[in-house]
Design a protein with these regions (language model features):
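N-terminal acidic leader/helix
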Residues: 2-31
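Amphipathic alpha-helical interaction modules
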Residues: 22-54
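Low-complexity intrinsically disordered segments
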Residues: 42, 50-88
Length: 88
């Protein structure tokens, strides 16, 4: 990422798309999925908040490149987990 601003916008955009999918599942999915969708909505909001906060402040002792590579990898893992929950 070229800047923190770009990174934050990318995080917001991805979480916004995930949130829209979770809303669709809660409205149009099976009855059993609707209860899980509400918990998933809250987890998506927490995910966005956590990673935008982490993008704002680099951990002391780490180089910026290593920190942001770690941040991107952690975000990919969390997004994959949310997508797996949406698909199940």
């Amino acid at each position: 990422m070229a800047s923190k601003r770009t990174l934050k916008r990318a995080i917001h955009s991805i979480c916004e798309d995930l949130f829209a999918e979770a809303i669709a599942v809660s409205l149009y999915g099976a009855k059993g999925q609707q209860g899980n969708a509400e918990a998933l909505l809250f987890s998506i909001l927490r995910l966005e908040d956590e990673f935008i906060r982490r993008a704002s402040h680099i951990e002391p002792g780490m180089t910026a490149k290593a920190y942001f590579n770690s941040l991107a990898e952690d975000f990919r893992v969390q997004v994959s987990a949310v997508v797996d929950q949406l698909n199940s």
